[in-house]
Regions:
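Structural signal for short hydrophobic segments within the conserved structured cores
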Residues: 11, 100, 162-164
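NTP-dependent small-molecule kinase module
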Residues: 2, 116-186
Length: 186
């Protein structure tokens, strides 16, 4: 809304939003039986469909594309799950390099609080339960999210992430993101 009020047409993309794969991916995840490679390929298909049918056409039409998570989240998840780094990079080599990446950094402990406030439960996959880190979903969530944070820390150097402290009010966070976004757009 903020960008559109400033005259920029926008399109939003994110995980599990493609017409081709999102519903099947959600159904497959509900059974908690996917192996790491199949899960990765499902998400890669979801991304590729959005790239071809939403991202590229929107950019060609002059839109600003806003991605709520992009390939870096998918790559980090795959790497934490033990997939080969070269394979993962090749899988997502079709992706366009974004003009900016804002990494909203929050400790796993704070993240779990926000997750409970929003969803009132923990998700099997977001908790890394498939990795066998702990039989306790809470402990597994914290360990898995810490591994993701460590992976993002390693990736940010290669992909030039702008780190944003997510442990602030919604208004403060929005103001900071707007400030960073203005620098990119102008």
């Amino acid at each position: 809304d903020w960008l559109e009020a400033r005259g920029h047409a926008t399109t939003q993309v994110g995980l599990k939003r493609s017409n081709l794969a999102s519903e099947e991916l959600e159904r497959a995840k509900n059974g908690n039986i996917l192996n790491r490679t199949t899960l990765s390929l499902f998400y890669a298909t979801d991304f590729a469909d959005q790239l071809e049918n939403t991202i590229i056409p929107s950019l060609r039409a002059g839109f600003v594309v806003l991605a709520d998570r992009y390939i870096y989240t998918l790559m980090a998840r795959d790497l934490v799950r033990g997939l080969d780094e070269e394979w993962v990079r090749n899988l997502y080599s079709i992706a366009l390099r974004p003009d900016a990446v804002f990494y909203l950094k929050l400790s796993p402990e704070k993240l779990i609080q926000r997750n409970f406030m929003k969803n009132h439960t923990l998700d099997y996959w977001e908790s890394g339960m498939d990795l066998g880190l702990s039989m306790d979903m809470f402990d597994s969530f914290v360990q898995y999210q810490q591994r993701l944070a460590d992976q993002f820390e390693m990736m940010r150097k290669n992909f030039d992430f702008t780190i944003v402290d997510a442990d602030q009010s919604v208004d403060e966070l929005n103001n900071e993101l707007r400030s960073h976004t203005e620098r990119v757009i102008h």
